[in-house]
Amino acid sequence: MKFVIEHLSKSFEKKVVLKDIDFTFEEGKIYGLLGRNGAGKTTLFNCLNRDIKADGGNIDTDGVRREVTAEDIGYVLSTPTVPEFLTGREFLKFFMDINEKSIKNPKSLDEYFDYMSIEPDDRDKLLKDYSHGMKNKMQMLINIIAQPNILLLDEPLTSLDVVVAEEMKQLLRSLKGNRITIFSTHIMDLALDLCDEIVLLHHGELEVVEKTDLDSREFKDRIIGALREGEDE
């Protein structure tokens, strides 16, 4: 599967955020989307997810004119959005009930909790009492159950403790084989550790940086240099 973006653009009043973007993402890879704060990473994700309307461009799959649908995309926000008046178990059951016809090979609720390393004592707690990391796990879990072809992750490891962040990285690596994963971050070392391809969002355009040597100082300097270009303009 391929996820094809053609001539995507978005402006807010006089500020151009996305400028005539052409890019193709391929199945089986985790793409690290790097950019400075305010570069437009979240705007790009919101356009891809149809949360906001792009000014122009096409978003298709497999290089054919089949528009990407809501079922194609899972979106994990940097700040988890969950119904805090429900328990973890109630939320998971509600999600599975309303998506019963589309969930492939469903498992029991406890099997899903086990998969995400959510402890038995936490499963019947209200979501408002979950930590940031646990809410993030629940948000990831419903996207895993839905099995979207394209997974957008907007800085999902922000504010997670070391253990939960490592669990999430291992999970993403295990899931990448049959989907396209686009991981937004401004933390370069995290992108280099987790991602197969590095993509810069820079001056409203996407640019691939070849990963010739992940550990080389030269490689990191190239990324930093590209992001610094024009910062004083």
Task: State where each predicted segment sits.
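Helix N-cap at the start of a conserved alpha-helix in ABC-type nucleotide-binding domains
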Residues: V162-V164
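Conserved structural motif at the start of ABC-family nucleotide-binding domains
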Residues: F3-I5, L18-D20
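The feature captures the beta-strand-to-loop junction immediately N-terminal to the Walker
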Residues: L34-R36
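Helix-to-loop junction immediately C-terminal to a conserved catalytic motif
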Residues: N49
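Catalytic Walker B motif of ABC-type/P-loop ATPase nucleotide-binding domains
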Residues: L151-E155
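Conserved ABC transporter NBD signature motif
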Residues: A54-T69, V208
